[in-house]
Amino acid sequence: MLQIIQYRKAASLDEAMELLSKNRMNQIIGGMMWLRMQDRTIPVAIDLCDLGLDSIEETEEGFLIGAMTTLRTLETHTGLKQYFGSLFQDAVKDIVGVQFRNTATVGGSLYSRFGFSDILCAFLCLNAEVHLHKQGKVSIEEYAKMGYERDILTHIFVRKEEIKTAFACVRKSATDLPVLNMSIARNNDELRLVVGSRPKRAILYKKTWTNDFESLAKEMAETVPCEDNMRGSKEYREKLVYALTLRLLKQVSEEEVA
């Protein structure tokens, strides 16, 4: 059972950071969708809802996504769809349901960096960076490898690119956590492949485009480190890496990159 001793609505990021630093058990609550299922006591729950972090701002260079932006907003944003196709819609459509996605936040999903995260898998194939209150700007690739530190994720910035993207995953049942997820981004001959739910955190692989899909799929299956867990064996995941790599390569080859 989750118990919260004190609830504080931060008036500024500095105040939120100060509250977070006072006790290692204090917590930024985000959308509270995963947090509420934990059995723990939080001395001070810190809410960022009044700090204007719940919108997506489009600029000439890219999209600045606030950490409190909901997954539903990410899913339905027309600007993101124009530049990145159905990447985000495909990544979030199986995350429980619309009601859940109306509350779950992008920042909470990315900060957690769960191995099964469809959100991390989708962002990792893009030219993106996270903005942290203390540490500043960090590339999404570097952030995916970092340990957990006492900091506040405020924004995610995604640069506009002329790319073709796709997302694929395998689940045992609809809305279940993925057995394996993958994303891809193609910019002419530059290829970025991401494999997540291995079951560890998603990993980015940078490759050169080839029409020999079979060879690249076999290479990925042999390269990606997979492990066993309750949802699937190491061997099963390796076969999924092969199959999903083939599927994604075919998807980004179907149309010319804009």
Residue ranges and their predicted role:
Residues 1-258:
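C-terminal structural segment of proteins
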